[in-house]
Amino acid sequence: PEKVFAFKDEEFVRMWVADMEFGVVPEILDALRARIDRRIFGYTGLYDDEYYRTFSKWCRDHYDWSFPKEQLCVSPGIIPALYQLTETLCGPDEKVLLNTPAYGYFLHAAEYAGVDVLTSPLHKKADGTFEVDYEDFERKCADPACKLVFWCNPHNPTGRMWTEEELHRVAAIIEKYNLWVVSDEIHCDLIRCGRRHIPMAKVMDRYPKLITCMAPTKTFNMAGLAFSNIIIRDPALRARFQERDKLFGMVNPM
């Protein structure tokens, strides 16, 4: 249903979505202009290594992390990827686990797939920061119906950048119960100076049931261009993910 605000535009501040108020940086604008000057906007796919080389270099330079080319899948966004992964991985009698407060689309993805949700509330400390309740988290992971964990790193909405120790503790629990884990890391570049993001993939460096989701869209205010990077280690899941791609591999020509 349509929502009507009883205020004039100048009387309220829109804060419902994570679009920033800063314009796109000149380097990105220059690249977009160069693309526009080609004057061709037909069906587009990734047919060589250039995109992988560019993204993998960013990951090496900023996170000291690398991954094989074949693991990289592209998606119009992390949200549609969440929907697709949840549908693919979970059956009707299985559950997904997420920490609360949580990004709303984790819940929406589960609801869309008809999957029940387990929640493990984060503990709010006296100083206002949040931490994982490890006992509760493990108890929920131990549920025989639990199949998939949605992990958010950095966390939305609390803003927590998880420490390496915290990531190892969470990873150990997930691996103990052999669960799939989707690590949403879309905010990994929107961090304070002097901090460095630690991908869950660096901590779970040999765990095959990890899916990492990243995109430049939040950091660089490009969400409307609709593209994201989904790194899927498991070959069978990767094949199923790509087979269910209703866009047949097409990407934004920009």
Language-model regions: role of each:
Residues E94, V115, K176-L179, Y207-P208:
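A short helix->loop->beta-strand "cap" motif at the edges of active sites that frequently abuts
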Residues K124-R192:
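Active-site phosphate-binding strand-loop segment of PLP-dependent enzymes
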Residues T88-A110:
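Conserved PLP-anchoring active-site segment centered on the Schiff-base-forming lysine
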Residues Y112-L118:
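A short helix-loop-beta submotif of the ANL/AMP-binding
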Residues P1-G77, Q84:
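N-terminal small-domain helix-loop-helix segment of the aminotransferase-like
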Residues K209-M254:
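PLP-dependent aminotransferase class I/II
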Residues F67-L72, P92-K95, Y207-L210:
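Short acidic capping loops at alpha-helix termini that bridge into adjacent secondary structure
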